[in-house]
Amino acid sequence: MAASSHAIAPTDAELLQAQADLWRHSLYYLTSMALKCAVELHIPTAIHNLGGATTLPDLVTALSLPKTKLPFLGRIMRLLVTSGIFASDGANGDGAAAEAVYRLNPLSWLLVEGVESEDHTYQKYFVLATVSQHYVDAGLSLADWFRKDLPEPLPSPFECLHGVPLAHESTKLLDEELDRIVEEGVAAHDNLAIGTIIRECSDIFSGLHSLTYCCGRQGNISATAIIKAFPDIKCTVLNLPRVIETAPADDAVSSVTGDLFHTIPPAQAVMLKLVLHFWSDEDCVKILEQCRKAIPSREEGGKVIIIEILLGPYMGPIMYEAQLLMDMLMMVNTRGRQRTENDWRQIFTKAGFSDYKIVKKIGARGVIEVYP
């Protein structure tokens, strides 16, 4: 039986608003392209080098762009200011961009190269990866992917289109530059906010004598930050051979080659920071089963520390939309997904854990302790 229909009779104002909303949703990709342009032109770094604020003519000069491009750069900057990527004094909608003073804000600060700050992780490669041709093509193939009757385990649209999974050894065979950008982008993304986590969730490390940090791209950055704050912790970084071979040397941690699915070096705690969202629920259970084998009982302080996006509208609609977009990024390009608290609870139970605690919600992410 067909569902009962409710006739929609929009007013004139609603129709015009609907058309404007359709424009926005259909053309949002141009905001991403404008951001990519700004990153490739090194606009955030140029503004930083000019003292953190600049006019459009000075920016054109600093970037060594033809003066004929000034009005076009003004239009790009106007969009990026409106989108919250830069701040501006004096910019308005009447085209008077040349009189505006453009400034960095917290978002564009993350795109400045060479900032000396423990809390700064250069995010250029995250941007370049997510708007790369291979990612975009995978997104454009979504409808075709839905129509195909594919055998399980289902390949991602990226894998279905390009023939290789993302962030895998075979990705390099598809495109070496893509592989490099993805590795750099994931590393930058994963290591951002480790200082915030250490400051706001220090209790998760207090009393630990050993920690296995699992499979972060260039995971030594986060692991080293933890050891610096808690020097009594003996930290082992578990990673794939190809990652360890290219990672910078670090005397503060011990690096071990291995595989999450087979064995994890024993420790009082195992830490998985932005790892599990790459994997299916079934694979997450297998990984967590290995984690459970690697730690002692809860009475002896055994636990798994998980830092992942925790899907939910608890931080408001803008942060929730960002979480959902990250979930779409996973759906299009990997076999993984972002998860709600209920999703995590079911996975923890299947992996044989007795309890868990959400220590804190930090931005889009949750810090979770899971107990054997």
From Swiss-Prot:
Which residues constitute the catalytic centre? 277 (proton acceptor)
Q: Which GO terms describe its biological process?
A: biosynthetic process; methylation
Which residues participate in S-adenosyl-L-methionine binding?
Answer: 216, 259, 273
UniProt-listed Pfam families = Dimerisation, Methyltransf_2
- EC number per UniProt: 2.1.1.-
Q: Which UniProt keywords apply?
A: Methyltransferase, S-adenosyl-L-methionine, Transferase
Which GO terms label this protein's molecular function in UniProt? O-methyltransferase activity; protein dimerization activity; S-adenosylmethionine-dependent methyltransferase activity
Question: What SUPFAM superfamilies does this protein's entry cite?
Answer: S-adenosyl-L-methionine-dependent methyltransferases, Winged helix' DNA-binding domain
According to UniProt, the tissues expressing it are described as: Expressed predominantly in root hairs.
Q: What does this protein do?
A: O-methyltransferase of unknown substrate specificity. Not active on resorcinol, orcinol, guaiacol, eugenol, ferulic acid, p-coumaric acid, catechol, caffeic acid or monomethyl ethers of resorcinol or orcinol.
Q: Which PANTHER family match?
A: O-METHYLTRANSFERASE (PTHR11746)
Q: Which family does it belong to?
A: Belongs to the class I-like SAM-binding methyltransferase superfamily. Cation-independent O-methyltransferase family. COMT subfamily.
The subunit structure is: Homodimer.
What is the name of this protein? Probable O-methyltransferase 2
Q: From what organism does this protein derive?
A: Sorghum bicolor (Sorghum)
